[in-house]
Amino acid sequence: MDVTPFLEPRIAPRAVFDSLAERRSRVRFMLPAPRGDWHSVTWGSFADDIRRMALFVSSELSGGERAAVFAPNRVEWMTAALAVQAAGGVIVPVYGSSTAEQTAYVIEHSDARLLFVDTAPLFERVLAAWEHLGQVRRVVLLDDSLDPSRAAAALNERGLSVPPFAEIERRVIPWSRALAVGAARDREDRAAFERAMNAVSLDQPGLMLYTSGTSGPPKGVPLTHRNVAVNGADWLRCNAPLLDEGAVDLLWLPMSHVFGFGEACLGNTLGWTSYMSDPLAVLGHLPQVRPSVFMSVPSLWEKLAVSSKGDLERLAELTGGRLRFCLSGGAGLKREVKELFHRAGVLLIEGYGLTECSPTLTLNRPDAFRFDSVGKPLPSVDLRLAQDGEILARGPSVFGGYHKDPAATRDTFTEDGWLKTGDIGRFTDDGFLQIIDRKKDILVTAGGKNIAPANIELRFRDDPFIEHVVVHGDARRYLVAAVWLSPATVEAHLREQQVAPAARDEAVRALVQRRIDRVNAELASYETIKRFVIIDEPLTVESGLLTPTLKVKRRKIGELFGDRLEALYDA
């Protein structure tokens, strides 16, 4: 499609209102309803609620102040976010998986003055952290059915302290009442909303995300409206051949992450109808909704590939058979999965970026892709490699510095203003970027050899039997590894080989050893894995071993499984 009309930088709420006259009666969102039905939300209804909520927010926030949102995906999540931005504020998403302590840290550190929250479990975490949230003026409940007294009672039953209920009542307001406040202001002054949006500068922050660092507390990353708008325009330019105005999107990625928020904003720009789903329902919704747009993480693409057993007709049944614009993000995707979908006529686009870059730096694209790379730099992005191979970035989508952390900001930029990504990379002869490792994850063996563990671990990415490998061996004579298996494929292999129950453990170890031997044959002797341990505990976000963006927390793995890994040197 011709994306030219959408390339001019603008604040995100403008995407809804600039095209509202022609879209008002059309459907923006489809929400799951009981008995498998869907409930529609029109562009007009969506826009009206943004307008009302923005005028409520204007009464609670001064220009440039921050509002946090702590909720799973729902239309009100996006309504609140765009309302805050339209009012000149900064939206601060909080991951739904955050504990009460983590939630308190982000809200307190961000200086949030307004908090949007949904679901009883999340509101209970807010109440549990109440003593740390003194700077929050108002808590807005996204669902009117959420009962503060019941949440307080639930904490009492668990023996946790609860703030006085009178204080809760004073600071908490339900969604409908907040909308009513905004509607009253709108009736008093019909020009107030437009004045507020017109006053927002592209160069002021509109979004602040917290990095899910593999160690240490998260850092606040303020992004200006221009940062995000320029990155969005690059996405449009690169993917134009796959884009359609008014497409059907199946939206399930958390909007608290930049990937999911970006998908929702792209839908606002291009007039998509987005069916809202969640991790438990998305595989069932795919063949029902039959989307042309679908963005996901590697684990789900891999589930689809395994379920199809390589049969293209079966794959079409599982996905609805109309996929056109598809992205995979958060971690690397196995090559065999990319090749399977490509045979089915679907290019799974991968790229590379980080929160500090709004977020994308490189993308594979319809007219230029390599499955062994993360693509070429975006049109507005400059990349170069430092002497040690670290990827350095510069451009209008790169942020200006961390919130309240000048020391970290200084450490993140070179003296001549390039952002240090912390990743080691290389360019192919035809200009595609390949990621080799995280700079800080370099291991130095007892023999003085510098080893990039990811360069070894990534060689297992396409292995059907192995989910993850984490290499260990800093200051040691040789390398060992923790191995997480793919239960379904290993089980199928054992059944196919008719392995007796008593021999299963030995057969599994032999299988893993063969896979490791195959990779070792491609490595220098000092890079080879000499011993391994199979870990049964799940490597997931919920287990605390992956960040919300699916990066391995090496320090946490060392804490939990270090004894088992160290024992391999004594075996």
Residue positions per predicted region:
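Conserved ATP-binding/catalytic segment of the ANL
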Residues: P377-S380, R384-A386, E390-T445, D462
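Conserved C-terminal "lid"/linker of ANL adenylate-forming enzymes
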Residues: V172, H468-V470, R515-A571
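Structural core segment of the AMP-binding/adenylate-forming
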Residues: S58-S59, G89-A180
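Conserved AMP-binding A3 loop
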Residues: S40-G44, N198, G206-G232
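Conserved pre-ATP/AMP-binding loop-to-beta segment of ANL
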Residues: S25-V27, A166-Y210, P217, L242-V248
